[in-house]
From Swiss-Prot:
UniProt-listed SUPFAM superfamilies: Ribosomal protein L20
Protein name: Large ribosomal subunit protein bL20
UniProt record similarity statement: Belongs to the bacterial ribosomal protein bL20 family.
Gene, per the UniProt record: rplT
Annotated GO CC locations: ribonucleoprotein complex; ribosome
GO biological process: ribosomal large subunit assembly; translation
Domain of life: Bacteria
UniProt function note: Binds directly to 23S ribosomal RNA and is necessary for the in vitro assembly process of the 50S ribosomal subunit. It is not involved in the protein synthesizing functions of that subunit.
Keywords: Ribonucleoprotein, Ribosomal protein, RNA-binding, rRNA-binding
Gene3D superfamilies linked to this entry: 6.10.160.10, Ribosomal protein L20
GO molecular function: rRNA binding; structural constituent of ribosome
NCBIfam families the record matches: rplT_bact
Disulfide bonds: none
Amino acid sequence: MARVKTGVVRRRRHKKVLKLARGFFSARHKHFRKAKEQLERSLVYAYRDRRQKKRDFRRLWIVRINAACRLNDLSYSRFMNGLKKANIELDRKILADLAMNDAKAFAALAKQAKDALK
């Protein structure tokens, strides 16, 4: 049987890795070995940060809701408890958007939450 060299397969594999490594710094987008190592790390970072993003946004929404609650003389926890008792089911994303863009509507929600706590 004739010996088969890896020329075509290797070139295809290298091209695939180097294409994915576009935009990396210095040798990490030029040299196959460095690009491959960095690509593995970048995929790990991407996987990790897709999960981290959800936690980060939830924290941001809570900070925004808390700031708006303080303007309405409520703490975040009492506000959320009041909403739950008033059977108002709005998620934190919507509440944070209301807090940022519609202060009157948020104030009305805060008033309902206060009334439910009494």
